[in-house]
């Protein structure tokens, strides 16, 4: 079954209906949510993962059985969201191949927690995190969909090290790709495209839309645009002068049309 970049069935909004934020503004929103409202980062990554899994399943035609999804995960919170998505997709009968681009001992707390959950659930074994380039190439070639959860919105400049190598493998594989927040290699604030940069058919932005995604230079890398509510109280961005305007009044995932 062909992957649908815009599977339909989600509420639609115009891009002009929302305030688009920089990476710095997004950091402030998350900081206030955590420090003043007690929102835990594990909550945010879990919500992001479920949203990613929901959209991925829709892109696959709404049926998980017989589908294979490779999830490229970094060592930070975005990678943790990708691992959470792997668990949900596995629950929905999708065959998942989560790949962490780094040494587990050096990964952030949220990644290690999600890996622990996946292992306890029997979804992955420790050796699955030690794939060689050849194994990753094979997994990508056999996938129906790739989820890009390699680097977060705060990255400036090109991806480095293992993340760059994995991104290049994904680019070479030319599989339909769902990017979380912004595709790897695209600057969330300016839209500048580095090398390597993943070319997504669909981008699911998280909580607030990022300015860089709308820029002309990023258009060929972001594909169709969606936005997911992560559960941050609307009062947090609004007190920073970022009105939400009932953006999620019809559902937690919305399709954004230019």
Regions from the PLM with identified roles:
Residues 2-145, 151, 155-161, 219, ...:
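A cross-family phosphate/adenosyl-ligand binding-site feature
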Residues 2-21, 143-258:
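YjeF_N-associated NAD(P)HX repair module
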């Amino acid at each position: 079954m062909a992957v649908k970049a815009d599977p339909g069935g989600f509420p639609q909004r115009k891009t002009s209906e929302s305030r688009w934020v920089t990476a710095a503004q997004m950091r402030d929103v998350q900081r206030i949510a955590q420090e003043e409202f007690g929102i835990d980062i594990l909550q945010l990554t879990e919500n992001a993962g479920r949203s990613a899994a929901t959209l991925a399943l829709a892109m696959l035609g709404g049926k998980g059985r017989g589908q294979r999804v490779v999830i490229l995960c970094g060592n930070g919170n975005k990678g943790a969201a990708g691992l959470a998505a792997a668990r949900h997709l596995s629950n929905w009968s999708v065959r998942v191949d989560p790949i962490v681009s780094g040494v587990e001992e050096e990964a952030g707390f949220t990644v290690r927690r999600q890996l622990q959950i996946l292992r306890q659930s029997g979804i992955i074994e420790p050796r699955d995190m030690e794939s060689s380039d050849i194994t990753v190439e094979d997994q990508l070639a056999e996938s129906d969909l790739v989820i890009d959860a390699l680097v977060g919105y705060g990255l400036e400049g090109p991806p480095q090290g293992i993340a760059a190598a994995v991104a290049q493998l994904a680019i070479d594989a030319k599989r339909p790709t769902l990017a979380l927040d912004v595709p790897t290699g695209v600057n969330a604030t300016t839209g500048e495209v580095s090398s390597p940069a993943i070319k997504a058919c669909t981008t699911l932005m998280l909580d607030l839309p990022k300015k860089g995604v709308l820029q002309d230079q990023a258009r060929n890398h972001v594909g169709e645009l969606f936005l997911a509510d992560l559960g941050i109280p609307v009062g947090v961005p609004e007190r920073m002068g970022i009105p939400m305007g009932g953006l999620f009044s019809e559902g937690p995932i919305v399709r954004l049309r230019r």
